[in-house]
Amino acid sequence: MNKRYPILFLALGVGVIAINLISCVSIPKGATAVKPFKKDKYLGKWYEIARMDFKFEKDLNNVTATYSLKDDGSIKVDNRGYNYVKKEWKQSIGKAKFVNESNEGRLKVSFFGPFYAGYNVIEVDSDYQYALVAGNNLKYLWILSRNKSIPENIKQQYLRKAESLGYDTATLVWTKQD
């Protein structure tokens, strides 16, 4: 029976390593997260202006993300959007934690247990009204606003920044907000 313990510990160790690898959070090459980042100013409701499309947001418009502080110091993430094909609202509740320090806009977000993805605020205006957010890699990008629209000069600034990092901004989906 003692011979089974090393195998059990090995299996547990491999499992922990696998979860850490799957939950790997990173930032696209050349990108840097906002620092200093003011968490309290970032909390609240954001409207999605544009995104790189992926399966969890397919066919959604009127997308919002609302961030609120939880008692344990993590951030509650409440994403909502209207599926215009199925004619129904979709909601996803998750949590976000800071990767390093809370004064740096590098977070990891999870909607599925121990599995995290990168959420990197790489640009935000001084009033925290507009934000450019990168995921783990060049497949994930969001332009956010506190309002349902964004000024053209901010939009162009964020597009230039994304392109300088290697994003193909021609593939952005411009989210309908009505």
Task: List PLM regions with ranges.
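A beta-rich soluble binding module of mature secreted/lumenal proteins
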Residues: 2-178
